[in-house]
Amino acid sequence: MPVLEPRAVIDTNEARCRDCYRCVRVCPVKAIRVVHGQASVDARRCLGCGTCVRECPQGAKRYRRDLPKAEALLKTRKFVAASLAPAFAGAFEPWALLRLPAALRRLGFHYVAETAVGAAWVAQASAGLARERKAPLICTACPAAVGYVEKYRPELVPRLLPLVSPMMAHARHVKARFGAEAGFVFIGSCVAKKAEAERPELAGLVDCVLTFEELADWLRDQGIDLGHCEESAFDEVPSGSARLFPVEGGSLATAGLASGPQDLGAAALSGFEALRDGLGMGQEGGVQLIEPLMCSHGCINGPGIRSEENIFDRRLRVLRFSQAPKSGPEAAATRADLSARYQACPPSPAMAFSEEQIRQVLEQTGKGRPENQLNCGACGYASCRDQVLAVLSGMAEREMCIPYMRRMAEQRSSLIMETSPNGIVILDRDLSILNANTAFEKLVHASSLSGQPISQYVDPDPFEQVASGQVALYDAPCRDEARGLSARLIAYPLPNEDRLAGIFVALPEPGEDARQLRRLKDETVLQARELQEQQVEMARQFANYLGQHTARGEQLVKKLIKAVESEAGPAEGSLGRP
């Protein structure tokens, strides 16, 4: 039976989520839902592969930690077994491998064995079934790959081997041998195993799943140093080549169906792209068995490994350990039931959207014309159309589109400039006019100013002082009787844009009501704040994508606000902040 309300194995630290959409981009099945800029994992869609955990640059994605559950088992059960996944040979230093059994016994485990003993039994059963069936069968050792087939490739469910994973095979063996009340803790590199242990039809077999990372933390917290542990034998070790299971092609080699890359009887697939493209292969090529591993290069690259070694060194460690003499009694054939049932369980009913609905969203984001659909991927989706479908499905937001948000920000900036009663001019570093609003054109009695040097209209000296860095903020009266100019000039550099901004506040004639001056200055403060907030908002949207910062701009504009307010004093409807 499918899991109707899956318990999430991956969640989000909202305080660390920075709107970078990296998790959306790397999730193989787009199981990330973005609401109000916060990215969260949809447990129904999630495969538990842990790609988002590994890829999140802010550490905002994290898998569920089950260490308290393991500690509780050791306190409440009379007998608890530890099953160590074969990837441990790549996760720990070679000198530490035979010290792990002693360390686990110090934690309180009564039985310590390699999960590879279950892998050997599953491989033997897989080989027998593969020889009986004509269509290529799909191995079921990887829970993320099984979840992908059940949720997103239901037509391939009949091809799944009707066998449990090595973890479940080992758990059934332990329960059959030591009693149903025996506790069973699996330790490996896989986050998806946490979800597999909670499948309703397998409930009660695996009591707790830990990662190698959690085990390392546990040993550290208990003050257990592997360097001070003696070498010790496992209670059971696998037969044959089962220690190869965590590397690409390992299960096929264990089953005796692949002697090398030239063998046409089996296909080893690792990484999502390989799974997506290769799972549906037909029997024309003579393939009997397909081994899918969601993590590229296999379980030695799982998200639960904390290792500074590169993937190839980890693989070499596993290969060497598989050839080393075995320490401990070899497990005999098991009488445990290895059968399993799998069935299609799409995460949600298929949602169909009309072309008109899609067109409307494209129009709303300024991408109605094909040439405006950049397909840049900044939002995390491969194409603009994919992003629109996600928006309609409630998985994404229009605001995730960077070009759309930039256009909106630019339009808002233009609106602020055009509605301001003050003259606003934007200059490049050569002090040529890039943009000027209508109020500035009226102030200098000219139009079509773009490209013209500012010196043709006002004294350039204040802008030269700002451009040279002589002053960070210029704020002083600017009078030119010959040109009929009487204003207060506030000039400052725009952050990260290599541009200067100038705001000209018209000064009243002598004798004019002082309240008008105060009102104008208040309006200037408001406009400056709006410009600041606009810059901050634009930077927030683009910072992770463009790598820019706005701290200096905020500081300068705040100085501007403080300078104007300190001279004007508190006004009616004061704009001051606590």
Regions found by a protein language model. Give the residues of each.
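Signal-transducing coiled-coil/dimerization helices and immediately adjacent hinge/linker segments
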Residues: 520-578
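PAS/PAS-like sensory domain cap-loop motif
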Residues: 440-450
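PAS-family sensory/regulatory modules and their coupling/dimerization elements
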Residues: 461-509
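Sensory coupling linkers of modular signal transduction proteins
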Residues: 493-538
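Sensory modules in modular signal-transduction proteins
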Residues: 408-441
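Short, charged amphipathic alpha-helical "coupling" segments at sensory-output junctions
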Residues: 398, 402-419, 513-516, 520, ...
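Iron-sulfur cluster-binding cysteine motifs and their immediate structural context
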Residues: 2-4, 9-12, 18-42, 47, ...
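Iron-sulfur-associated redox domains of electron-transfer enzymes in respiratory
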Residues: 64-363, 382-390
